[in-house]
């Protein structure tokens, strides 16, 4: 167990064998739910000089610097509210629940690999993170957004590498879920600027997105891909700015006109080059 006297509770509990690791942040008797903390599926193929497939836990994860990184950049208390019917009072009461969030191994690894590579190579590169259903994609996106928003490529740099982090979804429901998740991790007022429908947003229209990008409102901007076509031709162009764009459900949202307009809004030069490449590819296809 990794414990904290400040929180007066254990932060995480590990169940460790010679082949697999499982973790939970809450012990609840027979109802305890453990999650895999393996490097691969059931740690198949994992090799170690010690002979134990699980040695990465104490050799890598439980190191002093790693624990400090987990406490500073990953762990948080997630607060959820749910309305439940109170039969005695004959009305719905709001129940508040708290849960400690601790990253699973693949989430921690994904964030570290991306941040390390971006710090090494700088802006302008493309990455793909593959997540299966139920593997914590929203938290991975959230951790990555916050790490990139405060990333300095070199120790002597005066400014962060990226001017803004844009988290883009392709559906309203996903936007609301992502917005709520990212706000849970926020500790600074004005750090997050959300554009969408419903409550808890700073803007509702595409013009709000335009202003947020032009005036750098919020280190992290959350929006939907459908907002970009309406501003692609009117947004001001800042050639010296850099954006990190994190796209949820990229397999379904990164094709067609919406994606092209998003690239145009954020980088006119890149979009023009891409359009030329697309036209050339279409011409070749017609010849065939």
Over which residues does each language-model region extend?
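ATP-dependent helicase/translocase motor core
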Residues: 1-164, 173, 177-188, 219, ...
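Generic enzyme active-site microenvironment
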Residues: 15, 168, 246-247
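Short, solvent-exposed coil/turn elements at secondary-structure transition points
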Residues: 19, 198-201, 228
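Short, functionally important structural connectors and interaction interfaces within domains
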Residues: 94-95, 201, 258
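Conserved nucleic-acid-binding Ia/Ib motif block in the N-terminal RecA-like helicase ATPase lobe
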Residues: 164-168, 172-221
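Conserved RecA-like ASCE ATPase "motif II neighborhood" in helicase/translocase motors
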Residues: 207, 211-249, 253-267, 271-272, ...
